[in-house]
């Protein structure tokens, strides 16, 4: 069966809808946080776009501080800001290679922060980054052909990877 002829659906979800109740706050020299994004067994990601809204501490040294964005341990982008942008909400849009997606996915954020060229306190209060839970992920999902096989039940009627509300 021609996969391109099968239905394509757009799915967009905020981090809040994915279970991140409040902004993801990363503290310290090196800290990280993540959010789960699952893809149904009978769907294939054809395209993906991350709209990331975040704020980095205004006290950071911009040449030594950054935010890494990873999907399933694949580096998507390292976000570096100028001194003028620090402390202000920022937004970046990242196109994600759909080949990085599997059934169960982990979108991870690693914060590397430095506030001085001297000896630093790893837990200093000026070392923080905040990833907004209003950030969002948009996926174009292609329906995959399914074979008639009772061994697949309860799929396609129930799929634990499906993060849509039950109807």
Specify the residue positions occupied by each region the protein language model found.
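Short, solvent-exposed loop/turn segments in extracellular or other extracytoplasmic domains
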Residues: 62, 85-91
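Surface-exposed coil/turn segments at beta-strand junctions on protein surfaces, enriched
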Residues: 43, 50, 87, 100-102
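Short, surface-exposed tryptophan/glycine-enriched loops
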Residues: 89-108, 112-115
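Solvent-exposed serine/threonine-rich low-complexity stretches and specific carbohydrate-binding patches
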Residues: 66, 73-85
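Short, charged/polar low-complexity linear motifs in solvent-exposed/disordered segments
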Residues: 69, 94-97, 126
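Short C-terminal domain-edge/linker segments immediately following a structured domain
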Residues: 80-85, 98-101, 138-142
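Generic detection of short hydrophobic beta-strand segments and adjacent strand-loop junctions
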Residues: 35-39, 79-81, 90-96
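Beta-strand-rich recognition domains
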Residues: 1-67, 77, 111-167
């Amino acid at each position: 069966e021609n996969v391109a002829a099968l239905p394509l659906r757009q799915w967009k979800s905020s981090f809040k809808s994915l279970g991140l109740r409040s902004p993801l706050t990363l503290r310290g020299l090196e800290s990280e946080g993540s959010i789960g994004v699952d893809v149904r067994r009978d769907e294939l990601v054809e395209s993906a776009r991350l709209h990331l809204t975040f704020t980095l501490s205004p006290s950071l040294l911009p040449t030594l501080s950054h935010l890494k964005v990873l999907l399933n341990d694949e580096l998507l982008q390292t976000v570096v800001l100028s001194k003028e942008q620090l402390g202000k909400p920022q937004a970046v849009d990242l196109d994600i290679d759909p080949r990085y997606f599997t059934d169960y996915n982990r979108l991870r954020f690693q914060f590397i922060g430095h506030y001085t060229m001297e000896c630093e306190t790893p837990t200093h209060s000026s070392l923080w980054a905040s990833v907004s839970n209003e950030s969002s992920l948009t996926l174009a999902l292609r329906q995959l052909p399914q074979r008639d096989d009772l061994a697949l039940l309860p799929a396609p009627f129930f799929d634990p990877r499906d993060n849509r509300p039950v109807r």
